[in-house]
Amino acid sequence: MNKDKKCSFLKGFTLVEMLVAVSIFVILVFSVLAVLIAGQRVWNDGETQMDIQFEARRIMQRMSEELTYANPDNITISDTQDAITFVVPSSYNYTTGNIEWGNQIQYFLGGVNGHTLLRREGANTVVIGRNVSSVRFTLNGDRVGIQLVLSKQSPSRNNLQVELNSQVSLRN
């Protein structure tokens, strides 16, 4: 065999072919990475949205259950409509047929930044919920309207918000 003849089967990649292949690979990797990052952001936003929806429902249920037992004559709503004060029955006297009323209960916004919903009964104040942007109470006859807005920033820096509205029928 003649050593001067080059074997046709020993051909390799040229530099240009290698650069094109690497460029296509890099574009593909960055495309997949962009899709994964977008998916993670959507996941984080969805998870944060579910968290504040759950929190809003929990807060609304707690207030609604307690307000159900209030008497419309014993309800006071602040001028700014962001606080409500009421009393609920503590017991019923079967002998006299009278309802014995308990301590005053108040729901209001407070905390360090004003985004914490608090419940005060007597000298005890407890946190009902956090991330509360606004709460609004209205009284119409024997119904209390509650508008509750919660907001929270997701890990991907999106501000998410949930608004719940409820009408509570008063029993007493």
Language model: regions and residue ranges:
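Aliphatic-rich helix starts adjacent to a transmembrane/signal segment
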Residues: F13-T68
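N-terminal leader/signal peptides at the extreme start of proteins
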Residues: M1-F13
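Beta-sandwich strand segments
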Residues: S156-V162
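Type IV pilin-like appendage domain
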Residues: T76-R143, Q161
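A short hydrophobic beta-strand element
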Residues: D142-L150
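Beta-strand elements of well-folded, non-transmembrane domains
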Residues: Y92, L150-S154, V168-N172
